[in-house]
């Protein structure tokens, strides 16, 4: 019974959750339909055009900067799933390997896609044959030297024996002819035999020393040859790499990383070697990209999907879901076109330069913090512009309204009715300055200076994050990278372009799995900016103040007779044709003396 009750409660709770989710989705879809029906999207055509052009130029120049900055660094590839490469034959980096050079006197073919196994086997057999021939030659040379040394020693030993026999004969003759006293003075034959034995020992020691020196010299020569061969192999490699021994890396050029298949990328560890980094003037590309970003921000473009969604969270009524999605679509479209063109010019290197390996947390934190700060600055600038435009939408600082003076003279004194800068609006002396040919109020000068300060601060912050920390600050880069990879593998791989073959290729489970792996590996570059922008929008909402005063209105001549309910309407800036004179004067008073009624926002 308890189990049945528990299952019934679980089933009922799941149904309630599903109903709430379906209800929320239906309401959201209705809101989107209302937004599309109410808003005329044609008036946003110039905004969408600026989004496309700005995203295209920004991604293009920043991609060129990243490509040039990374091309001056040597990349190191390590095979992580192989213990001893020499025991299981040398491994070739997978991919399309096209080259015309010779490495260690080994000839290679240009196309390895067909008969790959036969080509690799022939390469390895040729290499092992050369090693075997070299070892046999060295052994034969050592044996020849040993034979020569032994023959020389044997000849010398025979000559010594002949000398010894001759010497013995001479001694016998001398013994027969000389006296007994002279025999004592002659040398003992035992001493002669001892001398011969010492001579033989010295000859054997010299022989062993010569052999040892010969072997050591040959070992040193072999080691030097191996080192020279490794150095030549590292320097002359263009498209293909033989793996080095354990704990050693194979250096390759950055273009070779593009030849690694996506399914085999987990088998390799891509590292950077900044020791060989050379000076270059590629920093100008980052400067131009950041300058373009600031210029299009000044024109009203966003050029960042994360910032667009932050505006949607800040003002969901103005930037609805449909409009925000349309903005982001044009941003992605411009970025993808720029990345494909950049890949045609410089190669698809950034597919792997932007792919994080074993530093996911570090990449996520860099993207999160940098995007949070940039979005905070952009939202602060947006709120400042919005507040200034609302306060000065009637442009009364340049043109004085005489009718308003007559309407407000019955309620307020001239001395108390002052503007934001605390000078009398009704003073006749102040009106003389409007008679000049060109007059700009101080608040407009202040607005322009603050605007320039915001833009410069955004420019240098963006330049710092891109140039120093090498962060993208934009999920559009990762999307452009993914679609550029698809372009290279699908569109450019085959000579004949067929649309139906592309759709069929996406039905492959292995390709879908590869794309999911690529997406997960580059996930910090996607989630970090979105999290940073959302956190910035939430942070600013904590300091947001209510700019509208809501009061209850009793049914008067403002409303028609059929409206019998009490309603809450905003009193400020409520332009209605049925308002009475008191409400008009009250609204005008609050509009021109907003500092007495409203607190200024923090940002």
From Swiss-Prot:
Matching SUPFAM superfamilies: Aquaporin-like
GO-annotated molecular function: water channel activity
Catalytic activity from the UniProt record: H2O(in) = H2O(out); glycerol(in) = glycerol(out)
Region listing for Disordered, in residue ranges: 135-200
Outcome of gene disruption: Dramatic reduction in development of mature sporozoites in the mosquito vector with no impact on any of the preceding stages.
Record-level GO BP terms: development of symbiont in host
Listed transmembrane segments: 40-70, 282-299, 321-346, 360-393, 442-471, 509-542
Residue ranges, compositional bias (Basic and acidic residues): 135-149, 156-190
Compartments reported by the entry: Endomembrane system
Membrane topology according to the record: Multi-pass membrane protein
The keyword DNA-binding appears for this protein: no
Biased composition (Polar residues): 191-200
Entry function: Required for sporozoite development in the mosquito vector.
Protein name: Aquaporin-2
Organism: Plasmodium falciparum (isolate NF54)
